[in-house]
Amino acid sequence: MIVRNLEECRKTERFVEAENGNWDSTRLVLADDNVGFSFNITRIHPGTETHIHYKHHFEAVFCYEGEGEVETLADGKIHPIKAGDMYLLDQHDEHLLRGKEKGMTVACVFNPALTGREVHREDGSYAPVD
C-alpha cells in the first residue's frame, strides 16, 4: 500500500509549476509506482488560459473546487466546469483550459502514467512515453 499526503508532496519534486504560471500540479501517483496510471491534484490559476493537446495520453479530470471552462478547438464548443463536474479527454481532444475568477482545483488521472516532470510542449502535448 502507498499512502501520501498532498501538503507533504507539495514540498518535494512531486510539485511542478507551469513555466507560464498558469497552473501547478502535485503528482501523487506516478509511473514508477507501477500501477498503470498517474494521479495529480492540479490548481488552475484565476484568469489563465492554457492550450493543451495530449496526443499520447488520455486524461480524466474531476473538478472539486472553483470554476473554469474547457473549449474544444475542433468545434469551438465551450464546456463550463464547476465543482462536481468531470470531463474525459477520450479522443486526444485539443482544447483550451481556462480558470475563472477564483481558478479551480482538479483531480487528474493520466494513462499512460506520467513520470512526474512533464510540462506542456509548444504544441500543448506531453512527450510520448518510452
Curated annotation (Swiss-Prot):
Supply one GO BP term: ectoine biosynthetic process
Pfam families per UniProt? Ectoine_synth
Record keyword Lyase present = yes
Catalytic reactions on record: (2S)-4-acetamido-2-aminobutanoate = L-ectoine + H2O
**SS bond partners:** none
InterPro entries reported in the protein's UniProt record: Ectoine_synth (IPR010462), RmlC-like_jellyroll (IPR014710), RmlC_Cupin_sf (IPR011051)
EC number(s) per UniProt?
A: 4.2.1.108
> What molecular function does GO assign, one term?
ectoine synthase activity
Which pathway does the UniProt entry assign to this protein? Amine and polyamine biosynthesis; ectoine biosynthesis; L-ectoine from L-aspartate 4-semialdehyde: step 3/3
- Which NCBIfam families does the record match to this protein? PRK13290.1
PANTHER family for the chain:
L-ECTOINE SYNTHASE (PTHR39289:SF1), PTHR39289
Q: Which family does it belong to?
A: Belongs to the ectoine synthase family.
Q: What does this protein do?
A: Catalyzes the circularization of gamma-N-acetyl-alpha,gamma-diaminobutyric acid (ADABA) to ectoine (1,4,5,6-tetrahydro-2-methyl-4-pyrimidine carboxylic acid), which is an excellent osmoprotectant.
Return the protein name.
L-ectoine synthase
Cite the source lineage: Bacteria, Pseudomonadati, Pseudomonadota, Gammaproteobacteria, Oceanospirillales
